[in-house]
Amino acid sequence: MSTGETLDPHAGEGQARAPRILLYSDDVDARQEVLLAVGRRLTRGAPDIEWVEVASPAAVIAEASTGRYDLLVLDGEAAKTGGMGVSRQLKDEVYDCPPVLLLTGRPQDAWLASWSNADAVLSRPLDPEDVQRAVASLVATQALAG
């Protein structure tokens, strides 16, 4: 199995299923930036990523609680309830919470991001290669754990 692939119990033997990623930001431009950075697939020949975009903390919590996701990408700069607080809540309350990639506003926020229990943190400005690499790595880690 190559990096970033997970097996679908309903697919034929050896076929990879598309990774499912939940993307939270109240800013449509921030969500678009992540989508463009990661691209449609994690690796050449892999299935297209199944993205679910949400813009409210309640939607993140409801979706993450379903257990359907391989990765959660949370915007730490979202208004009212940022991704740091949401990450902390999910890690405390959701059984077998998937990995969390937290996007912060600046490198100096890394110390605060550690409180969130996120599995990885990237600071703005986002480097598309770093975003793609982090997403692929976290999805692969989740696939091995699952």
Where are the regions a protein language model picked out?
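Conserved acidic segment of CheY-like receiver
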Residues: 17-39, 72
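C-terminal output helix
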Residues: 33, 126-135
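Conserved phosphotransfer microenvironments
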Residues: 35, 70-91
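Acidic, metal-coordinating helix/loop segments flanking the phosphotransfer/catalytic sites
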Residues: 53-71
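His-Asp phosphorelay/catalytic-motif detector in bacterial-type signaling
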Residues: 70, 94-99
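Two-component signal transduction core modules
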Residues: 72, 121-122
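Alpha4 helix (beta4-alpha4-beta5 surface) of REC/receiver domains from two-component response regulators
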Residues: 105-121
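The C-terminal output helix
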Residues: 136-146
